[in-house]
Amino acid sequence: QVSHLRNLSEVSIKPTACNVVIGVNGSGKTSLLEAIFLLSRGKSFRHSQPKRYIQHHNPAVTVHAILADGTTLAIQKQTDASTILRLNQTTVYNQSILTEQLPTLLIDPSTMDMLEQGSASRRQLLDWLVFHMKQSFHPQWVAYQRLLKQRNSLLKHSKNLSRVQLAELKSWDKGL
């Protein structure tokens, strides 16, 4: 269910396993995809400011979904960018909780650009694809990023490593 997103005032759909969205220009096809992305990722893929996608004269956009297993997800974004997230009617405070329930991947022309850019962009895309396949990957990825950041900080701020710093470096390397 989508309320007040661009040209979608009040829309309710019941998608099946595989769906094709068709319609004339300006009928809301992209807005529907944007609503799904907003629920999953907490942001629009078109604009960073909610006031740009919330319908005029409305205080907020709301997207609500019931997943196949009965789990309910909801997001409300207000014009001041404040956000309310709900999982099974309980307020949650971390977008990643909804993302784990409804992982999405936007494939558009910029996705193809990622493949031609540097290795960091490609790694980011691969990390996101792995997250889709194995959602337990996310906590491991967060821990890995933290270890890598600490290890690299040690290397960056130390020209000649002392014995203690070498031991610290070995522990970071072991964790990686």
Residues covered by each model-derived region:
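Pre-Walker A-like glycine/lysine-rich segment at the N-terminus of P-loop NTPase domains
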Residues: 1-38
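Short, flexible segments with low predicted structural confidence
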Residues: 3-4, 8, 24-26, 96-97, ...
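Generic structural signal for short, solvent-exposed loop/turn connectors between secondary structure elements
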Residues: 13-20, 66-72, 78-81, 156-162
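Phosphate-binding site recognition
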Residues: 9, 15, 46, 51-54, ...
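Nucleotide-state sensing region of NTPase/ATPase domains
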Residues: 37-121, 126-137
